[in-house]
């Protein structure tokens, strides 16, 4: 609700800004040669510019809670530079990345003997004190001439180990800046969330679940683009910060070289010892010095252009933030209307006493209580952001007043900052858990309402099914009785049929009857033929007898 609903804008706007920020190459390139030390007038102009930047950042912080990181930008960079200067080669930690050592000018290398890397003793303490004075002058509190400060040579091991510790410190500070920026955005978002009026309670219903799915998808895309943009900006910030610290260290180194050269030159002139080689190299050194001054002027112009461009981008991002806040407020009102509608439906399904008016009053009380709690939470978060800003301000004041005990105080401060970060993370986790629980409660209310309706419907359906089952069982019992009687009648009819079949013989059997008739006809015909044959046989026998008689009579007349 807090983190997801704030980023409802389409990914096109910020995606383009992120690409423009990421695609715009940094104009400041790492120079292969050593940069020249600035003039005292330029050192005086730098604190004035930084003071103007701090005033602009304070005005932006009064308008919103997103400029806390810009207020702490200059003090944190100075702290990183101090830490880089104080860390020695024997400090425990991760192995330092190999950084290119600034090449010493040939003239200075010829004049100055090589100093030992270790065993400096009081000279290192003197160098640290001088570095702190230079940083105070950069903040606008003390403006001193840098050419007259006797600084010792920066050791090669110290210069190699400083960037790694500085990178770790910058990462911790960037995490704090992200927390401050996130808390400021949450306070503005919650201030916009607490403003919906009660007149929106009877608002129009939402478009449906598809709109929320599209909104969640756009929020995820928005978060991914913001994370990518933030990572690109952090990488650019780290690289520029490391380059600036290297330039500052090498600036101190060159100022020390110039001081040593001037001191030796004055000593030789006092002793009236002519140094022809130094006189021959003086024009070359002067040309190199002027060339490096021109390079420094170009770098300052580039820095001013980059600063102006970043201010323009900051204005665009603020405008986008205002648009997002307006959309968040609109979505919050829609969510309140939807929540009221859902609660009214849930209470209507539960059939509360008092009817719709009682349910409406109870819903208004719940929403008013929730609105009050949201306002209290936004006020507490705003107070937390203000306290963090005041804490950053007090930290910057304390850093300027610290002395050699800065290391112990810095360790304590880092521990407290880590604890504060863990507490802030726990608070964010609790807020996320609270949001998840609220969503679960809403989903549970909807599920319970749906289950109650379904249970009531199933009860009525079960009663109807039971009635139908009783009727069907009665019909089955009646059918069983009828079936028993039918079987008994069937058995009686079967016995009667067998008895009648036995009595009737061929009755009803057409084929047998027809065959019987045919057989009877044939027998009659055969009997008639037999009678005719018998009569014919009798006639033949009579005729034979007559013939035989005639033959006998004939034989009797014949002579023997």
UniProtKB/Swiss-Prot annotation:
Gene giving rise to this polypeptide: CFAP184
Main location: other
Protein known as: Cilia- and flagella-associated protein 184
Region: Disordered, residue numbers: 1-209
InterPro entries: CC_domain-Cilium_Assoc, CCDC113/CCDC96_CC
Composition skew (Acidic residues), residue ranges: 41-61, 101-110
Chain intervals with Basic and acidic residues compositional bias: 1-12, 127-144, 179-209
Coiled coil feature spans: 357-481, 510-536
Localization (cell): Cell projection, Cilium; Cytoplasm, Cytoskeleton, Microtubule organizing center, Centrosome
Function: In complex with CFAP263, acts as a regulator of ciliary beating that connects radial spoke 3 (RS3) to the inner dynein arm (IDA) and the nexin-dynein regulatory complex (N-DRC). The complex is positioned parallel to N-DRC and forms a connection between the arch at the base of RS3, the IDA tail and N-DRC.
Keyword Cell division: no
């Amino acid at each position: 609700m807090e983190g997801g609903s704030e980023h409802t804008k389409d990914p096109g706007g910020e995606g383009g800004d992120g690409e423009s920020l990421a695609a715009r190459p940094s104009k400041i390139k790492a120079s292969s040669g050593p940069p020249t030390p600035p003039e005292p007038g330029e050192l005086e102009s730098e604190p004035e510019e930084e003071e103007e930047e701090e005033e602009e950042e304070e005005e932006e912080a009064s308008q919103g809670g997103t400029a806390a990181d810009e207020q702490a930008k200059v003090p944190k960079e100075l702290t990183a530079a101090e830490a880089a200067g104080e860390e020695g080669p024997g400090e425990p930690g991760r192995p330092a990345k190999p950084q290119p050592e600034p090449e010493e000018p040939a003239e200075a290398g010829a004049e100055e003997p090589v100093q030992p890397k270790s065993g400096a003793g009081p000279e290192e303490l003197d160098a640290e004190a001088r570095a702190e004075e230079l940083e105070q002058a950069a903040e606008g509190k003390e403006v001193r001439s840098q050419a007259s400060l006797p600084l010792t040579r920066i050791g090669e091991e110290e210069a190699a180990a400083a960037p790694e510790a500085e990178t770790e410190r910058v990462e911790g500070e960037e995490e704090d800046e992200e927390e401050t920026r996130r808390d400021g955005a949450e306070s503005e978002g919650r201030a916009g969330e607490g403003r919906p009026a009660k007149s929106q309670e009877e608002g129009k219903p939402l478009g449906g679940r598809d709109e929320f799915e599209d909104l969640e998808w756009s929020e995820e895309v928005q978060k991914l683009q913001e994370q990518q943009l933030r990572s690109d900006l952090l990488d650019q910030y780290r690289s520029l910060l490391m380059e600036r610290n290297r330039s500052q260290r090498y600036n101190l180194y060159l100022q020390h070289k110039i001081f040593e050269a001037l001191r030796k030159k004055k000593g030789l002139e006092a002793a009236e010892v002519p140094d022809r080689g130094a006189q021959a190299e003086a024009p070359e050194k002067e040309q190199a010095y002027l060339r490096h001054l021109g390079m420094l002027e170009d770098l300052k112009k580039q820095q001013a252009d980059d600063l102006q461009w970043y201010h323009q981008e900051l204005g665009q991002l603020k405008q986008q933030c205002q648009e997002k806040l307006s959309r968040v407020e609109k979505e919050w009102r829609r969510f309140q209307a939807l929540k009221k509608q859902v609660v009214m439906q849930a209470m209507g399904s539960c059939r509360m006493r008092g009817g719709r008016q009682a349910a409406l009053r109870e819903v208004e009380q719940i929403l008013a209580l929730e609105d009050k709690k949201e306002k209290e939470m936004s006020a507490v978060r705003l107070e937390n952001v203000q306290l963090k800003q005041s804490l950053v301000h007090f930290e910057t004041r304390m850093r300027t007043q610290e002395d050699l005990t800065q290391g112990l105080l810095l360790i304590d401060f880092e521990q407290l900052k880590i604890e504060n970060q863990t507490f802030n993370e726990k608070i964010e986790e609790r807020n996320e858990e609270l949001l998840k629980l609220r969503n679960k409660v809403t989903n549970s209310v909807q599920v319970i309402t749906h289950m109650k309706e379904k249970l009531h419907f199933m009860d009525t359906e079960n009663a109807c099914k039971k009635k139908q089952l009783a009727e069907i069982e009665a019909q089955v019992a009646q059918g069983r009785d009828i079936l028993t009687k039918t079987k008994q009648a069937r058995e009686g009819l079967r016995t009667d049929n067998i008895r009648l079949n036995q009595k009737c013989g061929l009755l009803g059997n057409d084929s047998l009857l027809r065959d019987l008739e045919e057989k009877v006809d044939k027998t009659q015909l055969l009997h008639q033929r037999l009678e005719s044959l018998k009569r014919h046989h009798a006639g033949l026998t009579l005729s034979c007898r007559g013939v035989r008689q005639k033959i006998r009579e004939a034989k009797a007349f014949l002579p023997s």
